[in-house]
Amino acid sequence: MPKLQIELPISEANWIKHIETLQNIENIVGTKQNITTALKTSIIRDLPKEPFGILLSGGVDSSIIAKICKDQEAPFRCFCVGIKGSEDLKVSKEIARILKLELITKEFELDEIEQLLLKVIKILPKPIIRDDNYIEYMVKVSVSAVLLSAMSLGDEKIFYSGIGAEELFAGYQRHVKSVSERGTWRGIDIKGLQEESWEGLKRMNNLVISRDKLISDSMRKEIVSPYIDDKLIILAMSLPTDKKIDSNSNKKILREIAKDLGVPKEASERKKKGAQYGSSFDKAITKLTKINGFKLKKRYLDSLIAKKKV
């Protein structure tokens, strides 16, 4: 089955149709062994011969990619950004030390963050921010700032990303809700884990893939996402709930795979943090909001969007 790579644009309708086709495939049983094989294959199959980058946050998803590429003796460097003292920088440096990876990092100052946000806002489509969607746009802007800044640190044209793993292996807070109290998350009615995970995959093109493609295209670079692979999706989505999540842990089987591959526990056992939090970019935006005289981040965002018109 071919890997879905985000350098090729796909319409929202065609993306949803493709995911629904995968959803209708039956009689597939995912195991730790065949998921490991599928993940390795997805990463190794199209490894570039020229030097490439890996966006290493220090989380389990990107650390698995780095470990497999290291085992293949592939020509790559890792990249991580954040505010001074951020968790992503701290953990990624430790992972790089243990695995002997070449890691390029940058600590950003507050004034640099505002300039990054302005760059990102110019790249992304102009939003209509309302009270019920500004958090979604805030996430889009802050994560895009992390992506743009990390990819700017190197002249590599191809960067590997761990996006997709959260949906496949139940890494988000709404997945926790789906096996506990249900309810809503950012205005979305939470369903059972299986249904919620498929719905999350259907939303990925609009919320994540198209965002990352806009950023990478603006730099004339390409993002490769090995977790967004047909065979891997089918196998992972066939897993029962208890293989993915319980009251103590999420992404359970992926963490087990990471340990088997030799990924350090600093990554394999690390709890999920969004890029905006692990990098502390979200904290920086909070500080910038106050410095610029606003009480709400939404108002600060509005002021930055207004500058886009100038």
Where are these regions (language model features)?
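ATP-dependent adenylate-handling active sites, centered on carboxylate activation for C-N bond formation
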Residues: I25-L261, Q276-L288
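N-terminal glutamine amidotransferase
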Residues: M1-Q23, I43, L147
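Glycine-centered secondary-structure boundary/capping sites
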Residues: P2-P9, P125, A170, M219-I223, ...
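Extended hydrophobic/Leu-rich segments
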Residues: W15-V29, Y300-L304
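PAPS-dependent sulfotransferase catalytic core
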Residues: R182-G183, K265-V310
